């Protein structure tokens, strides 16, 4: 997973609770990645987690890469991660909703990689809000 902010925390917790085998948190600020990894150990007892600098991440040998950074919100943003070393079966997911087709997802499609759009996150949030507000 790329990023260690608020959205990354929620996604990391959901992945751990869903039974992910291992989670690597890569972030520009290594201390923030380590803090999130430590939180997952402390609060969820999930120990198959590691942290590493984003600059040292190549995406090789993983099943999914989730961009939970802000990279991709603006047309001139750099790609969150080059996809040169990614397996053809690696799912590329982006939480950016606008634009829906970020440069990163476009790059993944051009390489024939499976992708997952950020819009799905909003759809589930709307569903949860609807259920929550209907309870009152």
Model-derived features: positions:
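Short, well-ordered alpha-helices that flank and scaffold nucleotide-derived cofactor binding pockets
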Residues: 13-17, 38-42, 106, 110, ...
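Rossmann-like NAD(P)-binding element
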Residues: 29, 56-78, 93
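NAD(P)-binding Rossmann-fold cofactor-contacting core
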Residues: 18-44
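Short glycine-rich anion-binding loops that position phosphate/pyrophosphate groups of nucleotides
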Residues: 6-7, 70-73, 98
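Rossmann-fold cofactor-recognition segment
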Residues: 44-55
């Amino acid at each position: 997973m790329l990023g260690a902010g608020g959205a990354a925390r929620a996604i990391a917790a959901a992945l751990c609770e869903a039974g992910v085998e291992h989670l690597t948190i890569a972030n520009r600020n290594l201390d923030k990645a380590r803090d999130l990894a430590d939180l997952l150990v402390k609060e969820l007892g999930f120990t198959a987690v590691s942290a590493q600098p984003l600059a040292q991440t190549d995406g090789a040998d993983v099943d999914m890469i989730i961009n939970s950074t802000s990279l991709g919100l603006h047309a001139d943003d750099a790609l969150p991660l080059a996809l040169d070393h990614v397996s053809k079966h690696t799912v590329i997911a982006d939480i950016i909703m606008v634009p829906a087709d970020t440069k990163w997802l476009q790059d993944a499609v051009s390489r024939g990689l499976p992708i997952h759009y950020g819009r799905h996150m909003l759809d589930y949030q709307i569903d949860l809000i609807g259920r929550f507000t209907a309870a009152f």
